[in-house]
């Protein structure tokens, strides 16, 4: 598998414009990225632009704080699927995890998994920069129990992004059959290679073209 096919080509900034989405989807077609990862408002346009392409549309749920109710997250998933999303990246209820309310964390994830079942792949963002190692392990274990397809490090909107150490811990926790996505601060081919070596099977990056081409990102960011 090429590196491009492991990348979710990402544009999640709040000021993203239609022109930028059109560029993003054009680049996804050209380079063969796994997906474009966009905010829900851009799912329909992205799906239209990628009709017939190998790249699919990924969107974000309960993003970036994870503090919506399970019911709201489930509605977001259904709406996104209706608009053409094939993958959804949801943020867990981080406060509930901190409170050791594992039942709520699991119910929250299950609501998304159930809403997406058979229609969209689910990635669970645990926001590693806010968690202890014990919490990272517990979050991954709950996500697997709830039926996720992937666990993911970060939103890119908090205090830190992906590290090889966190990827290795997540991979060790979920085993070989669940995907692990590194996201947040992954900007170069060398960054990607470190993440893959640690156990990542998907990369979230706004610098997808620079990573594949070997050029420096025009404007580095966290996404």
Curated annotation (Swiss-Prot):
Its EC number is 4.1.2.4. Pfam families: DeoC. The active site is at 89 (proton donor/acceptor), 152 (schiff-base intermediate with acetaldehyde), 181 (proton donor/acceptor). One of its GO terms (biological process) is 2-deoxyribose 1-phosphate catabolic process. It is found in: Cytoplasm. GO terms for cellular component: cytoplasm. Pathway: Carbohydrate degradation; 2-deoxy-D-ribose 1-phosphate degradation; D-glyceraldehyde 3-phosphate and acetaldehyde from 2-deoxy-alpha-D-ribose 1-phosphate: step 2/2. SMART domains: DeoC. Keywords: Cytoplasm, Lyase, Schiff base. One of its GO terms (molecular function) is deoxyribose-phosphate aldolase activity. It catalyses: 2-deoxy-D-ribose 5-phosphate = D-glyceraldehyde 3-phosphate + acetaldehyde. Belongs to the DeoC/FbaB aldolase family. DeoC type 1 subfamily. Catalyzes a reversible aldol reaction between acetaldehyde and D-glyceraldehyde 3-phosphate to generate 2-deoxy-D-ribose 5-phosphate. This is Deoxyribose-phosphate aldolase.
């Amino acid at each position: 598998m090429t590196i491009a096919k492991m990348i979710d080509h990402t544009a999640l900034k709040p000021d993203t414009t239609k022109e930028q989405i059109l560029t993003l989807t054009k680049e996804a077609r050209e380079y063969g990225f796994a997906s474009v990862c966009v905010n829900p408002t851009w799912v329909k346009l992205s799906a239209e632009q990628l009709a017939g392409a190998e790249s699919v549309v990924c969107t974000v749920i309960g993003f970036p704080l994870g503090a919506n109710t399970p019911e709201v997250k489930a509605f977001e998933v259904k709406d996104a699927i209706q608009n053409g999303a094939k993958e959804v990246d949801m943020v867990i209820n981080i406060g509930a995890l901190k409170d050791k309310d594992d039942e709520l964390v699991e119910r929250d994830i299950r609501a998304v998994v159930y809403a997406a079942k058979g229609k969209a792949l689910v990635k669970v963002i645990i926001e590693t920069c806010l968690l202890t190692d014990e919490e990272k392990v517990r979050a991954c274990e709950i996500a697997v129990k709830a039926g996720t397809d992937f666990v993911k490090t970060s939103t890119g909107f908090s205090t830190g992004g992906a590290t090889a150490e966190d990827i290795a811990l997540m991979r060790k926790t979920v085993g070989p059959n669940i995907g692990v996505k590194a996201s947040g601060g992954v900007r170069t081919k060398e960054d990607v290679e470190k993440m893959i070596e640690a156990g990542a099977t998907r990369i979230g990056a706004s610098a997808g073209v620079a990573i594949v081409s070997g050029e420096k990102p025009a404007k580095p960011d966290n996404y």
